[in-house]
Amino acid sequence: MERFRWQVAAVAAVGLALALEALPSVLCWLRAGRRQQQRPPRRQVLFFPSQVTCTEALLQAPGEAPSGPPAGCRCSLPHGESSLSRLLRALLAARASLELCLFAFSSPQLGRAVQLLHQRGVRVRVITDCDYMALNGSQIGLLRKAGIQVRHDQDLGYMHHKFAIVDKKVLITGSLNWTTQAIQNNRENVLIMEDEEYVRLFLEEFERIWEEFNPTKYTFFPQKKTGTSLPPQVSCFGQLVSCHSKCSHHLSQV
C-alpha cells in the first residue's frame, strides 16, 4: 500500500512538472487568441496617383513580402512605401483564393503579383471586359497563358466593376482601373477592408457574374437584330470573337 502511494505521488509530481513547463506556452496561446479577437477589422484607404517606387522586393520574394529592397538592388527609384506597394501587399497576402473583377487590367506590376500568387498555389479567378482585355498592353492574355481562369462578358454593356476579394475575407474596391495610366496619373481611390457583410455581397456578385459568363453560354454569332447588322469581329488571343458597338472605336488598337 505504501509503495502504491509513492507511485501515485511520483506520477502527480511528474504531471505537475509537465503542466508548469507547458504553462508559458498555454498563456501565450491564450493571449494571442485574445489579441486576435480584439484586433479591429482592417480599414485602409489608398489614394492615387501613386508615387513611383521600386516594387522588385515584393514581386521577387517567394513567400512573405519583405519590408525592404532586395539585396543588391541597383534600382534608382525610391524604395519607400506608396499606394501601389500597399495595394501589392494587400494582394500578395492571399493564401487560398483571389477573385478579381476588373474593367481594365494592364499594370505590369499588378499582373506579376497575380501570376506570383498563381505560382504559389493560390486559386485565382478573373472576370474582365471583353473589349479592354483585347487592347495592346492588357495583362489578361499573359494570365491566361499562365493557366489562370479568365471569363469575360459578351453583351452591349461594359463589365465595369473594379474589385478584388482576398481569401474571401478582404475586399479591395474603388475607382481605380488597374492600369499604369490610372496608377501614376489619375485621381483615384481604393478601399481595403475586412467586413464579412460587404465581402459576402461582393462575393455573391462575383459568383453570379462568373456563372453568367460561363463560356458554354456564349453566342459567337448572335442573331441579327431588326435593322442592324452582325457585330464586327476582332482577333482576341488567336480567336475571332464578336465585338459589339461599344468597342468598335477600339478596333484599330487591337
UniProtKB/Swiss-Prot annotation:
Reaction catalysed by this enzyme = a cardiolipin + H2O = a 1,2-diacyl-sn-glycero-3-phospho-(1'-sn-glycerol) + a 1,2-diacyl-sn-glycero-3-phosphate + H(+)
Q: Which key words are in the record? A: Cell membrane, Differentiation, Endonuclease, Golgi apparatus, Hydrolase, Lipid degradation, Lipid metabolism, Meiosis, Membrane, Metal-binding, Mitochondrion, Mitochondrion outer membrane, Nuclease, Nucleus, Spermatogenesis, Transmembrane, Transmembrane helix, Zinc, Zinc-finger
Q: Where is the PLD phosphodiesterase domain?
A: 155-182
Pfam family name, one: PLDc_2
Q: How is its activity regulated?
A: Single stranded DNA (ssDNA) hydrolase activity does not depend upon, but is stimulated by the presence of Ca(2+) and Mn(2+). MIGA1 and MIGA2 increase PLD6 self-association affinity and affects the homodimer conformation facilitating its phospholipase activity over the nuclease activity. MYC induces its expression and stimulates its phospholipase activity.
> Cellular component GO terms, alphabetically?
Golgi apparatus; mitochondrial outer membrane; mitochondrion; nuclear membrane; plasma membrane
UniProt-listed PROSITE patterns = PLD (PS50035)
Task: Provide the membrane topology annotation.
Answer: Single-pass membrane protein
Q: Give the EC number(s) listed in the UniProt record.
A: 3.1.4.-
Show which residues sit on the Cytoplasmic side of the membrane: 33-254
Q: Which cysteines are joined by disulfide bonds?
A: none
Taxonomy, superkingdom = Eukaryota
Subcellular location(s): the record lists:
Mitochondrion outer membrane; Nucleus membrane; Cell membrane; Golgi apparatus
Query: What are the BP-aspect GO terms?
Result: lipid catabolic process; meiotic cell cycle; mitochondrial fusion; P granule organization; piRNA processing; spermatid development
Q: Where is this region: Required for mitochondrial localization?
A: 1-43
Family annotation (Gene3D superfamilies): Endonuclease Chain A
Catalytic-site annotation from UniProt: H160, K162, D167
Please describe the quaternary structure of this protein.
Homodimer. Interacts with MOV10L1. Interacts with MIGA1 and MIGA2; possibly facilitating homodimer formation. Interacts with GK2.
Q: What does this protein do?
A: Presents phospholipase and nuclease activities, depending on the different physiological conditions. Interaction with Mitoguardin (MIGA1 or MIGA2) affects the dimer conformation, facilitating the lipase activity over the nuclease activity. Plays a key role in mitochondrial fusion and fission via its phospholipase activity. In its phospholipase role, it uses the mitochondrial lipid cardiolipin as substrate to generate phosphatidate (PA or 1,2-diacyl-sn-glycero-3-phosphate), a second messenger signaling lipid.
Question: Record's family?
Answer: Belongs to the phospholipase D family. MitoPLD/Zucchini subfamily.
Q: What is this protein called?
A: Mitochondrial cardiolipin hydrolase
Name the source organism. Canis lupus familiaris
